[in-house]
Amino acid sequence: MSNKIISLGSIEIANDKPFVLFGGMNVLESRDLAMQIAETYAEVTQKLGIPYVFKASFDKANRSSVNSYRGPGMEEGLKIFEEIKSTFNLPLITDVHEVHQCAPVAEVVDVIQLPAFLARQTDLVVAMAKTGAIINVKKPQFLAPHEMRHIITKFNEAGNDEIMLCERGSSFGYNNLVVDMLGMDEMKQTGYPVIFDATHALQRPGGRSDSAGGRRAQATELARSGMALGLAGLFIEAHPDPDNAKCDGPCALPLHQLENYLTQMKAIDDLVKSFEPIDTSK
């Protein structure tokens, strides 16, 4: 098995390369907050030498409650993304939920994300593939790791091979997620880059009745475990005031802890990838 390398400007994304950080905020709350968070991430990752892609959503279309904040929408969101990109010289990742969003989003954003709940929607997959953008596929909470090959095939047959696979936890009974570390290793066997979403894996879906709960206190432990597998990337969201974030605050890393957190993740990644592989199947 060979590791596929995805090139994003000067950044190389592969399971045997130094990890790439996909990070930012859950949803765009305001232009000023987005700029603040992007600046912090940019400064910290540059200091630590971590390749970095800014993440935020312009629309959270799958909130638990119809009254929950969704975001500024695509038009305003893309304006904010353009400003972040030009100000900080950062590549961008965001998610789409509908076919008509794919082409305009791909004109601004470098990586388009396929949400976990929509990962089997063929029309959306085809529309995303045809943009030619790099694709980040969130593994649905209800699919086994080996079933991700079917989604890969859909993208391939639609003409796109620039695919990353993202683990974000699996359903474990009601209102709970667990992370199958061996499942991430199984996804690595496809050769495609595997990303670990250590933020959303902390969710307790519907755990607060009309919104998701989370286990922010365990953010470090979960991410350390994932990084020990030798992955292509880490996906995290942070907020300067998680308790008052408009979406997924219970899972968000406090922004002031970002540097210490990433320092540990980089140390683990560097160590694990310095080891010679051991084939215990023989």
UniProtKB/Swiss-Prot annotation:
Q: Which UniProt keywords apply?
A: Cytoplasm, Lipopolysaccharide biosynthesis, Transferase
Which Pfam families does UniProt cross-reference here? DAHP_synth_1 (PF00793)
The pathway it acts in is: Carbohydrate biosynthesis; 3-deoxy-D-manno-octulosonate biosynthesis; 3-deoxy-D-manno-octulosonate from D-ribulose 5-phosphate: step 2/3; Bacterial outer membrane biogenesis; lipopolysaccharide biosynthesis
Q: EC number(s) of the enzyme?
A: 2.5.1.55
Q: Name one GO biological process term.
A: keto-3-deoxy-D-manno-octulosonic acid biosynthetic process
Tell me which InterPro entries the record gives.
Aldolase_TIM (IPR013785), DAHP1/KDSA (IPR006218), KDO8P_synthase (IPR006269)
Task: Report a single Gene Ontology molecular function.
Answer: 3-deoxy-8-phosphooctulonate synthase activity
Catalytic activity entry: D-arabinose 5-phosphate + phosphoenolpyruvate + H2O = 3-deoxy-alpha-D-manno-2-octulosonate-8-phosphate + phosphate
Which top EC class is given?
A: transferase
Report one GO cellular component. Answer: cytoplasm
Compartments where found? Cytoplasm
Q: HAMAP family, alphabetically?
A: KDO8P_synth
Q: Into which family does the record put it?
A: Belongs to the KdsA family.
Q: Which NCBIfam families match?
A: KDO8P_synth, PRK05198.1, PRK12457.1
* Full protein name: 2-dehydro-3-deoxyphosphooctonate aldolase
Q: Which organism is it from?
A: Shewanella pealeana (strain ATCC 700345 / ANG-SQ1)
